[in-house]
């Protein structure tokens, strides 16, 4: 498992995201779109949503784990296939690529372009956001992305192997597609949102340590705000942990209008703060491997 993990990390660093036609996030989205109409015909939308979520996970998993099974007869091929599939469950490099598009646009003074790039990674309406609000949304996305796009899948990889990481990633995809509180998805997507809350519960709290640790190493943290004070302002029981931790790390006022404000007296965020938050993100990501993931994999390899 350690070799598979190191290989997957190397693929991310060297090659970045795989092509869409082999990416499970893209494939699961296509599967969901293809079968969604059938399940929406049921009167009980909540139960339909449960069956739908299970169906998407199973149908998405079949070709990937069939590939793992078929490759298992040749060890080298099996390891390489496992590396590639594990890589598809998490991402480090792509976050930096998305964020760079936003910061480059802001540096050029092109607010419209920055809004457009931001809209690719957030759910909120970006059409009227100013530079500070764009910066806040980007930093919040970096903080949340550390959890659901990285810490969570590798957390489940440690304890449940490749299937755990893979399923965690598909659950996150389902939540991003259907975990809304609008009329269309409130009942239908409730199970997807619930599963996402469950799998991110521990990783979100782990993120507090790694964001704080990384900001201290980088000598960024100038104000320690009580994270617990702000997590209750979020609808999600998980989102507040990484976002409030990042606000504390950089002493920033992070705000989603009409929803929450974190660190009311903090500085208004700007482009430089987005770049600092990315440095925290990278250091937190790699320190998580060194401090948490690898030691646990070694312990489990020796004693289990």
Swiss-Prot record:
Keyword Transmembrane: yes
Record GO biological process: cobalamin biosynthetic process
Stored InterPro entries: Cobalamin_biosynth_CobD/CbiB
Record's subcellular location: Cell membrane
Membrane-spanning ranges: 2-22, 50-70, 73-93, 147-167, 284-304
Membrane disposition: Multi-pass membrane protein
Pathway connected to this protein: Cofactor biosynthesis; adenosylcobalamin biosynthesis
Highest taxon of source: Archaea
GO CC annotation terms, alphabetical: plasma membrane
Molecular function, one GO term: ABC-type vitamin B12 transporter activity
UniProt keyword annotations, A-Z: Cell membrane, Cobalamin biosynthesis, Membrane, Transmembrane, Transmembrane helix
Principal location class: membrane
HAMAP family: CobD_CbiB
Purpose: Converts cobyric acid to cobinamide by the addition of aminopropanol on the F carboxylic group.
Family the entry assigns: Belongs to the CobD/CbiB family.
UniProt xrefs under NCBIfam families: cobal_cbiB, PRK01209.2-5
Protein name: Probable cobalamin biosynthesis protein CobD
Organism of this sequence: Thermoplasma volcanium (strain ATCC 51530 / DSM 4299 / JCM 9571 / NBRC 15438 / GSS1)
Lineage: Archaea, Methanobacteriati, Thermoplasmatota, Thermoplasmata, Thermoplasmatales
